Structure formats: structure tokens, C-alpha cells
A protein has these predicted regions:
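N-terminal helicase ATP-binding lobe
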Residues: 1-214
């Protein structure tokens, strides 16, 4: 299946029975030999679809070479709860259209809605969508709102074999700098499986992601 066919099927709705066509930059993301670090595009042209459907295509339909450089887990980090809910709804709808709901899990990590069982099957592909406090605290081995005895599990799973996507970075504050430093340390110290970070915004300022190790 080509990415155009994949994207069209995923975006089919009652109002758009033929689905939508991807923009050229979305196709480049899905089919490219490497993943970008920055995505700076205007509001309303599909950043969320680029990250989720692009990652999903690379894992499920692309060549073995592309799959091998695409992390097993997609970690979608957002600054606000409402954005988490919107992104979750989109991901679930796209997976249902693609008939992948049973094979790729969507798990939400935010206050009051912590997905407590997402770590039970680390071998499976998964989409983790959460607020930056929940996700970054776990990546720092200080998991907010969870037993400290489970901190190392989430620390390991969120720092290995993951594609971290930071969306609406202009709203993240110091969390943005933390994401960059974490990626710098992963690159410096090495990880199990490919671990990559992507920063996305319509008003992307790259200065905060230049840190001591990144």
C-alpha cells in the first residue's frame, strides 16, 4: 500500500468518504530514509497526521529498511490536557479506519487518566499520548503519580525504542529544554533500538533545544 492510499483510508469520514490526500511534506516524512528533528509548518496543515500516520506507515507498510530505523513506540508529548484528548481521538479514529485498533494500542497519560497497563507488552507497537508532566517525569525516572518501584520500568521504556514527538512547543516552557537535553543524553550514551525526537510547531523557536548535550 502506498502512503497516499494509506493516508486516504485513514482519513475517511462520513463527510469525506474519499478521505484526504496527504501534502507532499507528509509523504516525505512517511517514506524518507531518515526522520527529521524539526517540523515547522503553519497551523491547520496536518502536523498531528504527519507524526501519527507517518510513524504508523513506517512501522506497518514501509520497506524493511525504513521500519528498522523507525522506533516501536510513538510518544506524543503535549503541554495541555485538551490537546491530549484531541490527539487521542484522532489516533483512535485513524486506527479504526485502518483496521489496526486491535494491534496498535493508544494509551493516554495525564492526570486522572493514567494508562496503568501500557507497559505490560513492551514488544508491541504503541502510541502514548500524554501531558509533558506525566511523560517527562517518567523519562527522568521520577514518574509522577505512580509507585516509585515502577519508575525504572517506565524510565527504560520511554528512553529506548521511542519516537518522541513534541507538539505545540511554544507552550512547553522549560519542559522543551528538558526534552532536548534528554535526547542529547540518549544519543551520547546510546539506547536499545532507535530513539529519536521531533519538535513541531507553527512558530518554532529552535534556541531552547540547543543544550549542553544536544
Amino acid at each position: 500500500m502506498t502512503f497516499v492510499e494509506f493516508f486516504t483510508k485513514a482519513t475517511t469520514t462520513p463527510n469525506e468518504p474519499q478521505g484526504r490526500q496527504p501534502y507532499p511534506y507528509q509523504t516525505v516524512f512517511a517514506e524518507g530514509d531518515s526522520l527529521p528533528e524539526l517540523l515547522n509548518v503553519p497551523t491547520g496543515v496536518g502536523k498531528t497526521a504527519t507524526a501519527i500516520l507517518g510513524w504508523l506507515y513506517r512501522r506497518r507498510e514501509a520497506t524493511p529498511k525504513i521500519k528498522s530505523i523507525t522506533p516501536r513506540r510513538l510518544v506524543y508529548c503535549l503541554p495541555m490536557r485538551t490537546l491530549v484528548e484531541q490527539t487521542r481521538d484522532c489516533a483512535q479514529e485513524w486506527l479504526a479506519n485502518l483496521e489496526l485498533s486491535e494491534t496498535v494500542g493508544v494509551h493516554v497519560l495525564m492526570g486522572g487518566a493514567d494508562a496503568s497497563n501500557w507497559d505490560e507488552h513492551p514488544e508491541r507497537e504503541a502510541i502514548l499520548i500524554g501531558t509533558q508532566d506525566m511523560l517527562l517525569s517518567r523519562a527522568l525516572n521520577r514518574g509522577y503519580g505512580m509507585s516509585r518501584y515502577r519508575w525504572p520500568m517506565h524510565f527504560g521504556l520511554l528512553n529506548n525504542d521511542c519516537l518522541w514527538v513534541m507538539d505545540e512547543t511554544q507552550l512547553m516552557g522549560v519542559g522543551l529544554i528538558t526534552t532536548a537535553q534528554l535526547q542529547g543524553l540518549r544519543s551520547k550514551l546510546a539506547t536499545y533500538g532507535v530513539t529519536h525526537s521531533l519538535w513541531m510547531s507553527a512558530t518554532l523557536d529552535t534556541s531552547p533545544i540547543r543544550t549542553v548535550d544536544h
